[in-house]
Amino acid sequence: MRSSIHASRLRKMGQSIPASTGPMARSANRFLQNRAAIFGLVLLTPLLFAVLTYPLWLPYKPNDIDLMAMNSAPSWKHWFGTDGVGRDVFARTMEGGRISLLVAVSSVVLSTAIGFLIGAISALGGRWADAIAMRSVDLAMTLPPVIFLLVLASIIGSGIWSTVVVIALLSWPVLSRMIRARLLELREREFVMASRGMGAGLGHLLFRHGLPNSIDILVVYATLQVANAILLEAGLSFLGLGVPPPAASWGNMLNAARSTAVLEQFPWQWLFPGGALVLAVLAINFIGDGLRDAFDPRAELN
């Protein structure tokens, strides 16, 4: 009798205590409760779908020239109109999105890898490694960004992968400082000190302890940096130092439409690529802010 009463009490206690969830699950719940982040997803999802799948359902290619339809206004045939040589603006806007996102994502992957490695080596590699890494970060951060971009782009040259390298080399120092700050705290933990005592090498410390404990920083940085990279690519292409024509990118489409005649008489040639650029950057920033708030440790206290 007593055992049955005791068992029923245990069942009631188990029902009254909520099941604990891990930190990643709690972060995901906080992200899904962020209205701005969900709004960003709603904006970005159809844009990504259109950009990635447009060759399957659009009858026009981005570089198809139709001299009989030069500077045509938006219509059922050409949804976004045509440019000065009769190319479909919708097709070029979609292709420009593909190239701009390719440049942005590739540069973010490269800058994230560089930033993590330098920051982690600085924190876990010893005194000399820390001094050398931090002096390189200080040097990179003291260079004027615009001048550095222009000089580097003029040296490397224009092109998709040249633009990727230029943007990546400008973007990694901030991440290195964040990773270093996180791992300086981590290296004093008992499990890291135990690994050192057992003879673990730098590679083991970086990828067994450093990387898993830096995932939140890397995810938030990468998301927000994609938006910054899209803007940097657009700026370089607008100045003629990014993706070269006839390849389409949002930046060189705006560059091609910068004349007063086009701005005033054919506004669809800059309005649609400019609108897509703003929409993508806005949506990605909303998502990045939502991820930052979701991973914020202070949210655990609330």
Swiss-Prot record:
The chain crosses the membrane at residues 38-58, 101-121, 147-167, 200-222, 230-250, 268-288. One of its GO terms (biological process) is protein transport. Residues 1-22 are annotated as: Disordered. Keywords: Cell inner membrane, Cell membrane, Membrane, Peptide transport, Protein transport, Transmembrane, Transmembrane helix, Transport. Its main location: membrane. InterPro entries: BP-dependent_transpt_permease, MetI-like, MetI-like_sf, OppC_N. Residues 97-288 form the ABC transmembrane type-1 domain. It is a multi-pass membrane protein. It is found in: Cell inner membrane. One of its GO terms (cellular component) is plasma membrane. It comes from the Bacteria. PROSITE patterns: ABC_TM1. Belongs to the binding-protein-dependent transport system permease family. Probably part of an ABC transporter complex that could be involved in peptide import. Probably responsible for the translocation of the substrate across the membrane. The complex is composed of two ATP-binding proteins (BRA0404 and BRA0405), two transmembrane proteins (BRA0407 and BRA0408) and a solute-binding protein (BRA0409). This is Putative peptide permease protein BRA0407/BS1330_II0404. It comes from Brucella suis biovar 1 (strain 1330).
